[in-house]
Structure formats: C-alpha cells, structure tokens
C-alpha cells in the first residue's frame, strides 16, 4: 500500500525563511530548466536536480570522463506553498522503493517479481508533490541498492551504509509550480575546472565504495533481515 507524507519546504531552514539557495552542476554554460524535461530513469524520475552544496555541484558538473570543464548555476527556490516529499524523513526502504520505480538494480526475473512487491509494500505515492528531496543514487549508492536486492545486506546496516557515501542530498523539481518558483542568479555562474573536481568526484566514490564494502563484509552485517525476507 502506498503511503503519503507532506513536508513544508520552510522546515528545512534553521531560521524562518521561505527561500533556499540551490546549485546545479552541468557541462553547459547556458542552461534553462524546462518543465516536463528530464530522464525518467533518474532517481526520482523526470525533473530538474539540484543540491544545497556548491562543492558537490562542482563535482557533478565534471563527473563525466570527457575532460571538459563545467559550470555551476546558482538558483533561489521560493518554497512558499510548495509540497515537498523528503525521503530523509522516511524509512530508507521507502527511498529504495522509489529507486526501484525508475532504475533497475538487477535484470533477473527474480528481481522483477520481488521489486514489484517491494514497491507495493514500501513505496509512497509521489504524484502531487512539487519537490522531492533525498539521497543521490550515484554509482556508490546504487552499489548499495544492487547488493541489497541480492540479499547481501541486512536492513540493520542500511542507514549506516548510506552515511558512508558522503555523496550528497539532492532536490528534484517536479511540478510546473516549482519550476515557476525557481529563479537563476545568473550573475553568480561559477566555472569548474575538470582536472581538480573530477579527481575529487572519483576519490569520493572510491573511498565510499571501500568503506561500504568493509561494512558489508563485517560482523555487523548479519544478513538476516534481507530484501527477500521483507516482503
């Protein structure tokens, strides 16, 4: 059964603000976010993805192995009256269920059958939300998802595994209303050097994978409450 939860965007702030600053890393100097665009195979489906961290945005701008410099575009999001789905406030299983809607963690018949049941049990209905916020499932985070559906990870260590990545929280702008509330601060466009920040991106990924493998192979991973037992 799908569940439903609403998180006012302003709750993200330590002070009572209605606007937040977000960054988008891209190879493109000229870029216009467009409602209805994007890839359905991304973590939360079609949408425009941003982060609160300018350093992570710089890494994401040059994460491709093409040796081209990138750009970070700075935006201000007016959160007034926006409905936000925050996966950090929900079970990690709910986040994994959302990934399974859009990305395949395995290509076996067993996975396809179990994934449908998992999504039905732990998924949430995302229609009607203006913004989705949660972990970014890049290579190392998706490594967790793949190992989990292979029954190699106990649920008791899932949240700790996610904390090891340090690879960032993202915002996905979903609705036309949210797009209209997003405004670029064009005078604050930042160039990104490929050699410096691609190396940082790769180093972060290598370190995350090592730490994750170490935890998965440790005694803390009892491999008792695993994917197939949670249905």
Annotate each PLM feature.
Residues 26-27, 48, 54, 77-81:
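Short, flexible loop/turn elements at secondary-structure junctions
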Residues 22-25, 71-75:
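A short beta-strand micro-motif
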Residues 39-64:
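Extended catalytic/binding region for NAD+/ADP-ribose chemistry, centered on the ART fold
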Residues 2, 6, 11-18, 42, ...:
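Conserved NAD+-utilizing ADP-ribose enzyme module
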């Amino acid at each position: 059964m799908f569940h439903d939860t609403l998180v006012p965007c302003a709750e993200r702030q330590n002070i009572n603000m209605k606007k937040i600053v977000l960054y988008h890393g891209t190879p493109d100097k000229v870029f216009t976010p467009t409602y209805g665009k994007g890839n359905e195979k991304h973590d939360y489906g079609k949408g425009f993805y941003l982060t609160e961290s300018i350093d992570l945005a710089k890494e994401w701008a040059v994460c491709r192995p093409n040796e081209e410099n990138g750009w970070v575009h700075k935006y201000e999001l007016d959160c007034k009256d926006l409905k936000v789905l925050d996966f950090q406030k929900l079970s990690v299983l709910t986040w994994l269920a959302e990934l399974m809607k859009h990305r395949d963690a395995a290509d076996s018949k067993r996975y396809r059958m179990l994934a449908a049941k998992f999504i039905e049990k732990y998924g949430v209905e995302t229609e009607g939300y203006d913004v989705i916020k949660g972990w970014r499932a890049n290579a190392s985070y998706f490594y967790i998802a793949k190992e989990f559906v292979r029954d190699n990870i106990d649920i008791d260590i899932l949240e700790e595994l996610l904390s090891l990545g340090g690879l960032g929280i993202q915002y996905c702008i979903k609705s036309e209303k949210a797009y209209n509330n997003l405004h670029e601060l064009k005078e604050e466009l930042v160039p990104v050097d490929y050699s410096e920040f691609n190396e940082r991106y790769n180093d972060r990924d290598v370190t995350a994978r090592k730490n994750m493998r170490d935890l998965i192979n440790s005694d803390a991973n009892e491999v008792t409450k695993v994917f197939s037992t949670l249905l």
